[in-house]
Amino acid sequence: METQRASFSLGRSSLWLLLLGLVVPSASAQDLSYREAVLRAVDQFNERSSEANLYRLLELDPPPEQDVEHPGARKPVSFTVKETVCPRTTPQPPEQCDFKENGLVKQCVGTVTRYWIRGDFDITCNNIQSAGLFRRLRDSIRRGQQKILEKARRIGERIKDIFRG
């Protein structure tokens, strides 16, 4: 009788452990911070990229406010990466690579899960024009603006001359 009770108790305990195992996510997945999840996404970007060099996190936009925290829920992310001097084939982690002077900068957006399972992300990265191009564009606009203002001044002087008579 005692053996039956012990066996029944052991069976019930096993059932509870089994149910608990189904409810709690497996140990192969990890609960990551927002930053860690983004760093993993950058690693995956580098693995899937056909670019010659590795990219490294340049700037991490703040995480959006979430009402309810569900570890498995997809979280929107936004960050910027920059090309490094390390070739993509290097075993060195991107965090140990220096940024390439005038390297490409990419703005990345997408979703990741904080409860990380390998490859569970959806990120798109697009080139951002380098600061040099923006500077040249700004300077061209200023020069064009100055030319327009100079022509408007000349037209104004001609109109004054017409009314003077």
UniProtKB/Swiss-Prot annotation:
Q: What Pfam families does this protein's entry cite?
A: CAP18_C, Cathelicidins
Alphabetized GO MF terms: lipopolysaccharide binding
Propeptide-annotated positions?
A: 30-130
- Tell me where it resides: Secreted
Determine if rRNA-binding is one of this entry's keywords. Answer: no
* Signal sequence interval, chain numbering: 1-29
Q: Could you state one GO biological process linked to this protein?
A: antimicrobial humoral immune response mediated by antimicrobial peptide
Disulfide bonds listed in the record = C86-C97, C108-C125
Listed InterPro entries: Cathelicidin-like, Cathelicidin_CS, Cathlecidin_C, Cystatin_sf
- Where would you say this protein principally sits, based on its record? secreted
Keywords carried by this UniProt record: Amidation, Antibiotic, Antimicrobial, Disulfide bond, Secreted, Signal
UniProt tissue specificity: Expressed in bone marrow myeloid cells, spleen and testis.
Query: RNA-binding as a keyword?
Result: no
The PTM Arginine amide maps to R164
Highest taxon in the source lineage: Eukaryota
Mind telling me which GO cellular component terms the entry cites? extracellular space
> What is the role of the protein in this entry?
Exerts a potent antimicrobial activity.
The entry sums up its family as follows: Belongs to the cathelicidin family.
Q: Could you tell me what this protein is called? A: Cathelicidin-7
The UniProt gene name for this protein comes to: CATHL7
